[in-house]
């Protein structure tokens, strides 16, 4: 091709390097084009840019997913993809189907945003490997892993109405050989104020107190065998509707 032949000689002189670490920073939102399915990925850097407290608020800068309130009294939210309601969209937790049945209306608020490493969004009909619900698309959530190097992560957040939220994550090896690792995720929020900015006599948002705790374990053997297990506990109390309603009937029944 018009380039003269060049010969290079390698000599074992100089300094030996045991390893090289290459670090880079991903964009907040990017489209993955090297796979079979074209999809949008929201990285952890993108989640940090948004004041997202839960999964529903993680799609504020996403052009693929829109989130709206399906019930103003209870604060339930639903997603829309390709113009259809969220019942036609499959939500996966590390490729496992979640948010089915009774958890569907409130499942978007049961996953804190700071628990996630990334979110993958693919539009259109997807594979039925994980279920048949993916008609308009799939949303896969990647949580923080037990093998993360970050031993402790603490996040305290206040919104414009001074609603406090606390997120905690700690990952640590249980054994010295790091074959058995675990991670504890905790989230707490409290919104005890009532707001009626349009003065219609109804709360704009429900009063809510929530606590979420998750514990995940990973055992990775030398022969490639991996075992994963864990649990998640959710406790929540919501109060919506008229401004003057204070659960008087419930208190009388106790």
Predicted stretch roles:
Residues 191-212, 220-254:
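Flexible loop and strand-edge segments within Gram-negative outer membrane beta-barrel domains
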Residues 154-158, 184-190, 229-235:
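Transmembrane beta-barrel strands of outer-membrane/channel proteins
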Residues 118-128, 138, 142-173, 206:
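Short strand-turn segments of transmembrane beta-barrel domains in outer membranes
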Residues 50, 54, 76, 106, ...:
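Transmembrane beta-barrel architecture of outer-membrane proteins
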Residues 78-80, 96-123, 213:
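Short acidic/polar hinge/loop motifs at secondary-structure boundaries
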Residues 145, 174-178, 219-225:
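Outer-membrane beta-barrel strand-turn architecture
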Residues 2-48, 56, 86:
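Short, acidic, small-residue-rich periplasmic hinge/interaction motif at the N-terminus
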Residues 56-100, 117:
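Extracytoplasmic beta-strand/coil segments of soluble accessory domains associated
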């Amino acid at each position: 091709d018009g380039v003269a032949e060049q010969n290079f000689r390698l000599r074992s002189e100089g300094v030996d390097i045991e390893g090289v670490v290459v670090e880079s920073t991903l964009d907040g939102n990017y489209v993955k084009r090297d796979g079979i399915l074209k999809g949008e990925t929201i990285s952890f850097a993108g989640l940090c840019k948004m004041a997202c407290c839960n999964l529903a608020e993680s799609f504020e800068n996403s052009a693929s997913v829109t989130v709206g309130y399906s019930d103003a009294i209870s604060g339930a939210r639903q997603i829309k993809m390709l113009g259809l309601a969220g019942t036609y969209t499959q939500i996966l937790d590390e490729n496992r189907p979640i948010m089915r049945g009774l958890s569907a209306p409130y499942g978007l608020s049961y996953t804190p945003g700071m628990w996630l490493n990334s979110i993958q969004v693919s539009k259109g009909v997807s594979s039925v490997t994980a279920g048949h619900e993916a008609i308009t698309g799939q949303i896969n959530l990647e949580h923080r892993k037990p093998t993360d190097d970050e031993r402790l992560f603490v996040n305290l957040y206040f919104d414009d109405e001074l609603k406090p939220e606390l997120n905690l994550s700690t990952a640590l090896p249980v054994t010295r050989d790091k074959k058995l690792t675990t991670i504890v995720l905790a989230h707490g929020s409290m919104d005890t104020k009532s707001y009626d900015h349009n003065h219609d006599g109804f709360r704009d948002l429900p009063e809510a107190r929530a606590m979420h705790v998750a514990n995940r374990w990973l055992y990775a053997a030398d022969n490639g065998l991996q075992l994963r297990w864990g649990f998640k506990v959710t406790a929540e109390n919501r109060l919506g509707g008229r401004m003057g309603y204070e659960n008087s009937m419930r208190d009388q029944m106790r």
